[in-house]
Design a protein with these regions (language model features):
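Thiamine diphosphate
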Residues: 1-174
């Protein structure tokens, strides 16, 4: 019975809110993005810059979960490889071809990017797990599922419907 008490009962339950307070970045932290840009930038680059601001915030940086269903380089995210690494439970098992480059493909046991390969459903499932962690584990995460718009919902539409039913909290960036 002790284990059931620690788990707060015999039936699984989703909590409507989490108990931990997160200190979010102030709007001023994003001032470089809010000011007029000298030259045009893509929305993807704007997102990566905003993500970099959030990664500097000590309260939420470990809660950020960038999930990419395909090659991160095409989204301009290769700068994050060295900064936070690509999650791999076994770490780097090979020498990357691009090892000599500044933004080489760095896999790490403590990596934060989930690089799912061409597996939209797997990436969507990872996003759903992180997006509902607040209610199932009292552990609020901030997941970003980054995908190609032309493939996005066509491949994970049902999963998105499920996310709505489970009151998932996260971002879909297409």
């Amino acid at each position: 019975h002790e284990r059931r008490q620690a788990l707060k009962g015999y039936l699984p339950a989703r909590q409507p809110n989490f108990t931990e307070k997160l200190e979010l970045p102030a709007l001023e932290d994003f001032s470089q993005l809010l000011e007029e840009q000298n030259k045009e930038i893509s929305t993807t680059i704007a997102f990566v810059r905003a993500l970099n601001v959030m990664l500097k915030n000590k309260s939420i940086k470990d809660r950020l979960v960038p999930i990419i269903a395909d090659e991160a380089r095409t989204f301009g995210m290769e700068g994050l490889f060295r900064q936070i690494g690509i999650y791999s439970p076994n770490g780097q098992q090979y020498t990357p071809q691009d090892r000599e480059q500044v933004a080489y493909y760095k896999e790490d046991e403590k990596g934060q990017i989930l690089q799912e390969g061409i597996n939209e459903l797997g990436a969507g499932a990872s996003w759903l797990a992180a997006a509902t962690s607040y209610s199932t584990n009292n552990l609020p995460m901030i997941p970003f599922y980054i995908y190609y718009s032309m493939f996005g919902f066509q491949r994970i539409g049902d999963l998105c419907w499920q996310a709505g039913d489970q009151q998932a909290r996260g971002f879909l960036i297409g």
